[in-house]
Regions:
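Glycine/threonine-rich phosphate-binding loop and adjacent beta-strand/alpha-helix elements that clamp
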Residues: 1-177
Length: 177
């Protein structure tokens, strides 16, 4: 329906981290291929016309529905270059139940240049960093057998979801450097 985004985790090949805090190699690794996966939902801003400072903790608040008792959510905020490379700036991971959720992300600090964009990537796994959640509500997902693994479809409400960014334009003019 309008105003909702859906995406599905297929059990046999869960999404991985693609750099960032949880990935190997860690740090600023281009994750554009990870973002292009069918089990990764992305939201990309328009290009910035002026420099912007992003400094502090990032937080995702979202309304997510699913028929499963639990699911995992890996949220990554990336800086996207004019050439399309996506470098992680902040990320968070949580095991959640359907409904209104909050995913705190690590703090970051960078200046976004004109022509660059921000991208939020959401995936229902971050394997092998975290065990794949079977969707059964089990407290210890690694104890579930392969037969217990479910295909999980998530539905995000755009109207009830927000990404909180500590961002402001960079001052320019006489006396400003």
């Amino acid at each position: 329906c309008m105003g909702r985004e859906s995406w599905t985790r297929v059990t046999g090949l869960p999404a991985g981290p693609g750099g960032g805090t949880f990935g190997l190699p860690g740090g600023p690794v281009d994750r554009a291929q990870t973002d292009a996966r069918s089990d990764t939902l992305t939201f990309t801003t328009e290009a910035f016309a002026t420099p912007h400072l992003l400094a502090g903790a990032v937080r995702l608040e979202a309304e997510i529905a699913t028929s499963m008792l639990s699911y995992d959510l890996h949220a990554v905020l990336s800086r996207v270059t004019e050439k399309g490379a996506a470098y992680p700036l902040a990320e968070g991971y949580a095991t959640l139940e359907p409904g209104h959720v909050t995913v705190p992300m690590r703090a970051t600090c960078c200046t976004l240049q004109p022509g660059e964009r921000l991208r939020l990537s959401l995936s229902p796994a971050c394997f092998p960093c975290f065990p794949v959640n079977p969707g059964t509500g089990a407290q210890q997902p690694w104890e579930a057998s392969l037969a217990d693994q479910n295909i999980i479809t998530l539905r995000l409400s755009r109207a009830n979801s927000r990404l909180h960014l500590p961002m402001q334009p960079v001052a320019s003019g006489p006396g400003k450097e």
